[in-house]
Swiss-Prot record:
Its cofactor is Mg(2+). This is Molybdenum cofactor guanylyltransferase. It is found in: Cytoplasm. The gene is mobA. PANTHER family: MOLYBDENUM COFACTOR GUANYLYLTRANSFERASE. It catalyses: Mo-molybdopterin + GTP + H(+) = Mo-molybdopterin guanine dinucleotide + diphosphate. GO terms for biological process: bis(molybdopterin guanine dinucleotide)molybdenum biosynthetic process.
Length: 201
C-alpha cells in the first residue's frame, strides 16, 4: 500500500447538497446513497478513493451517514450552499489550505487533483474544463475567510462572485469527461458506463 501522497492538505468532500435534480420515477433521491462500482454508495466510493490520495478526508454534510468517517456538520439546515461547508471547514480544521471536491464529481483524476494541490500563492485554485469552471473542485487558502464571512452575512451565495473577488487562478484541463457532475440520473448512468469502460481497459 502506497503512502498517501498529500499529507499537508486535508480534503473535504462536500456532501451537503440538495440533490434537487436527481429523481427516479419523479421521486427525489439522495444521490450520496446511490451505489457505485462495488461500493454501497457514492459517498463510500468517493471517501475510499480520496483516502488513497489524501492522508485526511472529511465529509461535510447536513447530517452524518452510516459510513464510518469524520464529518463536519453544516448547521444551516434549511439553506443549501457549499459556502457553508467551506466556511465551516476553515473554522474547524484551522489549516492554511483545504482541497474541496463535491460528492457528485467521482471521475476527477488523481493527476488533476495533484495539479490543483501543487499551486500555492493564490486564495483559490480551481479547475476549468473546456466548457465550464468548476469552482468546487478547488484548493482554497484560509485568506478567503473574510470574504466567506462577508458573503454569508450578505447572503450572496453565488460562488463565482466570491471566487472572482479573491486572488484566484483557473487551471485548464482538456478532459471534459472527468469533470462530469452527477446532477441527474442520466449523468449517474453515464458515470457508471465510464467507470466500467475504464475498468476494462
Amino acid at each position: 500500500m502506497k503512502n498517501p501522497i498529500i499529507d499537508n492538505i486535508p480534503c473535504v468532500l462536500l456532501a451537503g447538497g440538495k440533490s434537487s435534480r436527481f429523481t427516479i420515477n419523479n421521486i427525489q433521491i439522495n444521490k450520496a446513497l446511490m451505489p457505485l462500482k462495488s461500493y454501497s454508495s457514492l459517498l463510500e466510493y468517493q471517501y475510499t478513493r480520496l483516502l488513497k490520495l489524501f492522508k485526511q478526508v472529511i465529509i461535510s454534510a447536513k447530517k452524518s451517514y452510516e459510513l464510518n468517517a469524520p464529518y463536519l456538520l453544516e448547521k444551516e439546515s434549511g439553506l443549501f450552499s457549499p459556502l457553508f461547508g467551506i466556511h465551516n471547514a476553515f473554522l474547524t480544521l484551522q489549516t492554511p489550505y483545504i482541497f474541496f471536491i463535491p460528492i457528485d464529481a467521482p471521475l476527477v483524476s488523481f493527476e488533476s487533483i495533484k495539479a490543483l494541490c501543487g499551486i500555492e500563492n493564490f486564495s483559490v485554485v480551481y479547475a476549468k474544463s473546456p466548457t465550464k469552471e468548476h469552482y468546487l473542485i478547488s484548493l482554497w487558502h484560509k485568506s478567503t475567510l473574510n470574504a466567506l464571512n462577508y458573503t454569508l452575512k450578505t447572503q450572496n451565495y453565488r460562488l463565482s462572485d466570491l471566487v472572482k473577488n479573491t486572488s484566484s487562478v483557473a487551471i485548464h484541463f482538456n478532459q471534459e469527461e472527468e469533470f462530469l457532475n452527477l446532477n441527474t440520473l442520466k449523468d449517474y448512468e453515464l458515470a457508471v458506463q465510464i467507470l466500467k469502460k475504464r475498468a476494462n481497459g
